[in-house]
Amino acid sequence: MGEIIFKRTKGLTEKETHYCPGCTHGIAHRLVAEVLEEMNELDSSVCVSSVGCSVLSYEYFNIDAVEAAHGRAPAVATGIKRSISDKNTLVFTYQGDGDLASIGLGETMSAAVRGENITIIFMNNAIYGMTGGQMAPTTLEGQKTTTSPYGRDPKTAGLPIKMCEVLAQIPSAI
């Protein structure tokens, strides 16, 4: 009898993902689900996702999930964490860079400044992926997108936001 090399985590549903070929969201989902299972958190975690490629993550994670308005996942996660009776519940957001670093920048920064007891999983592909690959706030200098076919020019588009480095400067962000 052969050795079992891979076993599907209980943290994922059986549904096939809708992601584009080569996209890392499916791998990230598997890794998050495996960690939740390893930590025995599948029954005590809540995922909050919002508009963008992450919008359908509730279809794939086999845990409680909530969908937030565009960019508002940290605010919704904060509300859940503060109001839930079991304070050990792991509440996390799963967001892309367009959602987190653009329309949700204020919510992201505010949650960090307040030191909210939530986890934010940041999927940075440096473009707006769901709508066709347009330049995002995190698009790298010189990176070509559908709206910057010659590459991001800092003279006209500014420099990319380096969200992890920005958040690392906030003492209350854990």
What are these regions (language model features)?
Residues I4-A69:
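Active-site diphosphate/adenylate-binding microenvironment
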Residues H25-A28, E37-E41, R82-D86, V113-E116, ...:
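Generic secondary-structure signature for well-ordered alpha-helical cores
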Residues C53-G129:
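Thiamine diphosphate
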Residues K10, A136-I174:
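Conserved thiamine diphosphate
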Residues C23-L31, L42, G71-A75, G106, ...:
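Conserved active-site and cofactor/substrate-binding residues in soluble primary-metabolism enzymes
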Residues P21, D97, R152-T156:
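Glycine- and other small-residue-rich loops at beta-strand/loop junctions that grip anionic moieties
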Residues Y19-P21, T93-Q95, I174:
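Short catalytic-loop micro-motif centered on adjacent basic/acidic residues
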Residues G132-Q134:
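Short aromatic-enriched loop/helix-cap "lid" or pocket-rim segments at secondary-structure transitions
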